[in-house]
């Protein structure tokens, strides 16, 4: 579930914001659309007759344009202000070191234990770097999917999809996912 992965969810959010901006033409509306939807913000701009966020925020009425939608952009600006000078608001902050990693695209479906063995990478490292992989993958009841961008520590940057496929071997590569058991 890539929603659990801060890197993938950030990429998806950036893509949505870029789309909203292309559709709406202003960053305040694009950011508000992240909460309210691009169609909803387009409707608001058309009804009010402007793309000016302040005017829309003060005059647009809709049963769905409530507190969260009205305050999404101002909340973003507040968070941005804090991010630009966090020490002013929180005092001294100890920052975690930058996470460095390398990604390879899974060439086929494969078991996590086979991947771990082929790469010679500890399971904890794989788990920490791949939060989108859920418990069934780690327990072995599901496979890491083909096309998944497997994140490895930067020290493993010599690995490619092709090298992984060779290291796994044909008996450890699968064309499809393990079928889920259904309970009656």
Question: Which residues fall in each region the model found?
Answer:
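Extracytoplasmic and endomembrane cell-envelope/extracellular-matrix remodeling and assembly machinery
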Residues: 1-23, 28-184
């Amino acid at each position: 579930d890539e929603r659990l992965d801060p890197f993938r969810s950030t990429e998806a959010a950036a893509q949505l914001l870029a789309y909203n901006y292309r559709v709406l033409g202003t960053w305040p509306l694009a950011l508000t659309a992240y909460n309210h939807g691009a169609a909803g913000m387009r409707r608001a701009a058309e009804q009010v007759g402007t793309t000016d966020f302040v005017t829309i925020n003060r005059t647009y009425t809709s049963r769905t344009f409530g507190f969260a939608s009205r305050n999404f952009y101002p909340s973003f600006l507040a968070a941005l202000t804090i991010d630009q000078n966090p020490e002013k608001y929180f005092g001294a902050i100890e920052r975690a070191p930058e996470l460095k990693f390398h990604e390879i695209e899974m060439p086929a479906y494969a078991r996590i234990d086979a991947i771990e063995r082929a790469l010679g990478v500890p399971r904890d490292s794989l788990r920490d770097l791949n939060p989108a992989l859920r418990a069934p993958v780690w327990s072995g009841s599901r496979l890491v999917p083909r096309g998944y961008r497997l994140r490895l520590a930067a020290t493993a940057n010599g690995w490619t999809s092709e090298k992984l496929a060779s290291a796994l071997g044909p008996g450890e590569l699968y064309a499809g996912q393990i079928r889920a058991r259904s309970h009656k």
